[in-house]
């Protein structure tokens, strides 16, 4: 059965300008999509509803403790993006990466990988160039990262955006993943 619905602007998330694949600037307006009977037809509506439900229930507890001035509880999230940077030549030899974007097979971790030599090591010049370009692209969208560093495994790195309201952080996380792939695949 097909659901009919309507699209509404999610004014809790900021609109932004993002380049289309052909470099045309496009205004993106965050939206929600619901059926005429109220069912969520997207993934954002349940998030917004759960944020509101959490606020309502938390306010009950806050009032039990005697606080009569609070009006709302706002949740925040600061998701980390851990990622691997793989050279194009290596990528082209790995069908699992090509078809799924993930490692489906491989070898056990080399002995000694649990040591901190990569984690505390300096960031390689090519990786730092990637991180710099990534930050510049994210800043254009109003997304700021708090930290970026090597992770434990070889070629593994991390980007940690600044905490934000849950729905905005979720929107930013989707954009971060998109921009990471775009920057990594650019020549």
Locate predicted features.
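Glycine-rich, acidic/polar active-site loops that bind/position phosphate-bearing ligands
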Residues: 1-187
């Amino acid at each position: 059965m097909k659901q009919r619905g309507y699209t509404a602007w999610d004014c809790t998330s900021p609109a932004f300008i993002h380049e289309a694949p052909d470099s045309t600037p496009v205004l993106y307006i965050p939206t929600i999509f619901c059926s005429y009977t109220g069912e969520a037809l997207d993934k954002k509506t349940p998030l917004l509803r759960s944020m509101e439900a959490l606020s309502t229930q938390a306010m009950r507890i806050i009032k039990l403790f005697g606080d009569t001035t609070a009006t709302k509880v706002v949740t925040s999230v600061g998701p980390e993006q851990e990622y691997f940077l793989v050279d194009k030549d290596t990528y082209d030899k790995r069908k699992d990466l090509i078809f799924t974007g993930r490692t489906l097979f491989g070898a056990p971790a080399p002995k000694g990988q649990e040591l901190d030599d990569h984690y505390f090591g300096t960031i390689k010049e090519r990786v730092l160039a990637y991180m710099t370009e990534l930050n510049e692209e994210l800043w254009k969208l109003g997304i700021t990262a708090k930290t970026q560093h090597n992770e434990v495994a070889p070629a593994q790195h991390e980007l940690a955006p600044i905490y934000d309201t849950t729905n905005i952080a979720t929107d930013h996380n989707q954009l971060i993943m998109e921009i990471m792939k775009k920057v990594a695949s650019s020549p």
